[in-house]
Every structure is written in C-alpha cells, then in structure tokens.
C-alpha cells in the first residue's frame, strides 16, 4: 500500500505493422521508461505493471532514453530553434494549436508543448535566447492555470532521428536489402530526417543494441499471473506469423 505504480503498455499495433504506435501508448511507454531509469538512479520501491506483449518488446538503451530528457528553468539560455529541432527529432508533432500529448506549437517567442508524463501543457515564453517563464495552460481552453519553476522534457518516440541514428539506419538497411529504390519512402524519409509511418518497427536498425525491461531494472523480483506463460507463447507465435 502506498507504493507508486508504473504502467508500461505495449505498442497498440501489430508486429511489423505499417502504422506507428498511437501517441497515447507511445507517451505512456516513454513516461514509464523514464521513471524506471529514475528508480535505478535514486533507488526507491515501486510496482511496475506490464503485459506479456510489452515484456517481449526490445527497447532503446536506458542511457539513450535518459540523454533525450531535457531540463530547463526560467533564466536559462536556450536556443529556441535548437529546442524546436530537438522536439521534431524526438517524435513531437508540430501543430497550429496544442491540444494533446506529443504536440508543440510556435508563435513568435512563445513555444507551447504537451509532453509525456504531464497532466497539462506548458507555455514557454522566450525573450531572445532567455527562457523568461514556464506557464501551465489548459489545452482545451488555452488559458493559463499556473506557473512552473522548472520542467523535464521527455522524448515522444523510441526512435530519435539524430545524425547517428539516421546513419546507422541507412547502413543497416543497405546491408540487409541492398541499394534502395527511388520509390522507397521509408529510406528516403529517414535519410532526410523525416518521420515515416511504422518506422518504429525498424527499431534494431537505428541502434547498435537494444535492451529489455530486465536490463533497465536488474535483479528486480518478477511476479507472473497464472496465464502469463500462455500469453508470452501466443505473442511469440504472432510475431513469427507476421514476420513470415
């Protein structure tokens, strides 16, 4: 009783699908993975609820997820254009008006964003390269509801389109399939640093290695329910079926 509970869902799409995980599932996963990293860095007790599907799914190394987290507070010197680029490579979607998790909008020196793990959106007010204030606002009404002294910004996708990951993807893709054709939309989009529907299913091509939940939390006691082994076997069979 009283222990924090972290929920790690699986992607809400089929294995090797041509669509990306939904924004809500992606946000909840990144929120949980970031919290799991914090459990190791600042040890404390917690309960992690997950599924057979999520348990079988490989994930980016914890060090890379942690490196994507951005911390800021009023008074910091921040290149707004660099922050916008960071949001785009981390999986955020640029929109005219922020309404949901995973979105950001820019109007002059104001940057609105709604990140994983947040209950409300934030409005960053810049004067030049100085972050003057962090205001909380209601995404439905766009009205300010409070102030923040700091923020921690997580990634929105398990695929960060950095020069390193793009280069690794291109190399891995060519090694696996040879020279891409001109109409290969996936290869072209990633090469240009653009996100492409379903690219998360190519996760091993973006990173040197992947990890599991057990790599994030070594020596952690695991409790299975009575149908867990059957669920794991069914998921494994589904993965093989879609692969073939």
Spans of model-derived segments:
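ASCE RecA-like P-loop NTPase motor cores
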Residues: 1-244
């Amino acid at each position: 009783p009283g222990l924090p509970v972290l929920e790690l869902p699986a992607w809400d799409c089929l294995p090797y699908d041509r669509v990306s995980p939904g924004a809500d599932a992606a946000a909840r996963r990144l929120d949980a993975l970031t919290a799991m990293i914090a459990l190791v860095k600042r040890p404390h007790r917690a309960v992690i609820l997950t599924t057979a599907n999520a348990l079988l799914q490989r994930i980016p190394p914890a060090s890379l997820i942690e490196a994507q987290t951005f911390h800021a507070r009023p008074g910091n010197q921040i290149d707004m254009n660099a922050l916008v680029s960071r949001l785009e490579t981390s999986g955020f979607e640029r929109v005219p008006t922020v309404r949901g998790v995973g979105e950001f909008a820019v109007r002059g020196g104001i940057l609105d964003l709604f990140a994983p793990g947040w209950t409300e959106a934030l409005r960053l007010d810049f004067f030049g390269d100085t972050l003057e204030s962090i205001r909380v606002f209601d995404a439905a009404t766009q009205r300010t509801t409070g102030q923040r002294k700091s923020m921690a910004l997580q990634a929105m996708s398990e695929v960060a389109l950095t020069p390193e990951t793009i280069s690794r993807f291109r190399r891995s893709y060519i090694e696996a399939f040879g020279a891409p054709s001109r109409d290969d939309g996936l290869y072209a989009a990633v090469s240009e640093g653009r996100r492409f529907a379903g690219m998360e299913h190519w996760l091993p091509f973006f990173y040197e290695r992947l990890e599991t939940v057990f790599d994030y939390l070594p020596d952690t006691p695991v409790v299975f329910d009575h149908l867990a082994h059957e669920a794991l076997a069914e998921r494994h069979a589904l993965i093989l079926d879609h692969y073939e």
